[in-house]
């Protein structure tokens, strides 16, 4: 969970059956809050929260990568996402205002991601992507 903030996306994933989750945020206060929220929700043993940004904290491969942050941050981190995606993984970007939809879609494509679904509701956009080089099943 990039820009984990309160940790809500990672905590929800764990509550819905994910085995483990990692969150990263540049704000140490958010990292502390996410850890406290994980403790309150009984998932602290499965949730690792790190201070920093995606490029210096995330490593390995992930099945799902989430980012519920502003468009500018999504565009900035997008080039780092494909290398972190396991085969068949999905990147879910949300927190995008509808005025920035096309700009974010263009940026995700330029970063090596292929949008496979775009959802819009009440002025907000969520974009689900796969890696551009992912083979069709």
Predicted regions and their residues:
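A short glycine-rich, Lys/Arg-flanked "PGG" loop and its adjoining helix->strand segment in the class I
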Residues: 75-90
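Core SAM-dependent methyltransferase catalytic element
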Residues: 114-137
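Short strand-turn motif at the edge of the Rossmann-like AdoMet-binding core
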Residues: 93-98
């Amino acid at each position: 969970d990039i820009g984990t903030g309160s940790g809500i996306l990672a905590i929800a994933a764990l509550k819905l059956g994910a085995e483990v989750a990692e969150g990263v945020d540049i704000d140490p206060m958010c990292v502390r809050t996410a850890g406290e929220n994980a403790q309150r929700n009984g998932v602290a043993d499965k949730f690792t929260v790190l201070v920093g940004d995606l490029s210096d904290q995330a490593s390995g491969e992930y099945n799902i990568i989430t980012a519920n942050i502003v468009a500018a941050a999504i565009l900035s981190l997008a080039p780092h996402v494909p290398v972190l995606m396991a085969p068949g993984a999905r990147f879910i970007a949300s927190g995008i205002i509808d005025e920035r939809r096309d700009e974010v879609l263009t940026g995700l494509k330029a970063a090596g991601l292929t949008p496979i679904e775009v959802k819009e509701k009440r002025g907000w956009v969520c974009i689900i992507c796969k890696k551009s080089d992912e083979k069709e099943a």
